[in-house]
Structure formats: C-alpha cells, structure tokens
Design a protein with these regions (language model features):
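Carbohydrate-active catalytic/glycan-binding domains of CAZyme proteins
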Residues: 1-259
C-alpha cells in the first residue's frame, strides 16, 4: 500500500536452542496492542530487539527500535521480564540522550557496564550511550563513532581488550558490503578498517545485514538479518563464524550441523 514495505507489528517472539541449529518457538514475549495511542500499537514499527541480563536486578532487559509507520519518530523502547521467555512488561518509549535512534544494538562489557549503540543524525553517525546500572535508561554519558559515514546495523564485541564493531551501509532493505572498525576505548578512537566478509557474495554480506555478535564456547558468531522486502514476515537469519585476531576480522559463510 502506497509503495511501503510493511506488515502490522505483532510484537517480539523468542526462540531457544542448545546448538543454534534446532530452534524452539517460545511464543510472543512482548505483544503489540490494538489500543489506539498505545506506544506498542500494531500500526507502529518494532525492530531489532536485544536483551541483556542484569545481575543486580536479576531482570532481563529488552531494548528495541520503536518507530512510527513512516520511520519519522526514531525512538527506542524498553521492556523488562523475569525470564528470557517473558512475558516482558513495557517500561518506556524514549529518545536516548535526545537523539534520534534507528538501527540499534546492546553491548555488555566485561565489567558489567552496558551500552546502547544506535544509528543517529538521520543515519549519518553511530552513537554510543552508557546505560544506568539497572539497564533501564541511559545515564547521560555518550559519545559517537564513524561520524558522517552513514553506517547502521551495529554489532559489537570485545576480544583481547580490543573492541570490534561490524556495521552496514544505509541502503534500506537492499544488501550492501559490511565494514568493521576497531578501538581500544568504547567511547573514542574508532577506526574503520574494511570489509570482514570473504568468499562468494561477500560484497553483499551474503544478502544479509549485521544484527548481533555473540560468544559460544569461546568462539564468536555473527547473526545476520536476511530481509525479504516484498514479504517482510518471511525474512530470516543466518549465524556465521567470526575470526578476530589482533585487529583483523574475518567472516565466512558456511553450512553447520552444530555450533
């Protein structure tokens, strides 16, 4: 309708797996609303949910991109639950540190401090905002990375004291080549290095877009969104091995029977 690619927002689902190959659908953990005026109304956009466990509160905290149907609001949403399978209770809609926020991720550092990393300034700059101790808000301490470089879809991790951040270019639903950057300080000194992807379809990031890096059994893995703009509800994911060594980063596409 009107040339827009969208589906009604129904909420966020949770899937669980022991091997990242076979997945169990745990159902909707945060549901959209039919109530007019609700920040979670089905006519709005909810994307890229990320969940961290807070040891102090013993709560699971979700942050996500929350927007109007035309992507002009550019806010974040926050929700909290006792279990990763929910149900999550909506806490607030916000504009972190009074900046617009679109593609975003969460990162928990080795010291337990957590950060919201989000594309801002109409996708021209990535911002890095420290969260409060309970992870339910930003604490006012923030910085930026890659100003005027138009990077989005951040996925960040740390290895051997060095931060790595994988990002995407801004081409809407269409795939593009990824770039990664490194820094010894999460708030400053970020330097773009190059495309980490190798092999066939590397320049299109294997027709995906970075969304998160996680660690399992001492190895890092990159999760990609695979958008289907003609039928967004049929979009999927892939999980790929990441090799990080002394400031160099390599991602390869391969089939796995287990991780």
């Amino acid at each position: 309708e009107n040339g827009l690619h969208r589906v009604d927002f129904i909420g966020f689902s949770c899937y669980s797996s022991a091997d990242c190959i076979s997945w169990k659908n745990e159902g909707l953990v945060l549901k959209a609303s039919d109530q007019p005026g609700s920040p979670l109304h089905k006519s709005r956009v909810g994307e890229r949910p990320k969940v961290l466990y807070n040891e102090k509160s013993r709560k699971y905290v979700m942050w996500f991109h929350l927007d109007s149907h035309d992507y002009m609001t550019a806010h974040t949403g926050v929700a909290v639950a006792d279990r990763p399978t929910g149900p999550f209770q909506f806490v607030r809609e916000m504009c972190p540190n009074r900046f617009d926020s679109r593609d975003m991720t969460l990162f928990k550092d080795t010291d337990g401090k957590a950060y919201l990393i989000y594309s801002s300034d109409w996708n021209k700059t990535l911002r890095i905002a420290q969260l409060t101790d309970d992870y339910l808000d930003v604490n006012g301490v923030y910085s930026h990375a890659f100003p005027e470089q138009e990077r989005e879809a951040p996925a960040i991790f740390i290895k051997d004291g060095l931060y790595y951040m994988i990002t995407s270019g801004c081409t809407g639903w269409e795939p593009n080549n990824a770039l990664f950057g490194i820094s010894h300080n999460i708030f400053s000194g970020w330097k773009l290095i190059g495309d980490p992807c190798t092999g066939e379809n590397a320049r299109q990031t294997y027709f995906g877009q970075s969304t998160y890096v996680f660690e399992k059994d001492g190895r890092h893995y990159l999760m990609l969104d695979h958008w289907n703009p003609s039928n967004l509800k049929e979009s999927g994911y892939s999980i790929l091995p990441v090799r990080a060594d002394n400031g160099q980063l390599t991602v390869s596409f391969q089939e796995y029977t287990s991780l």
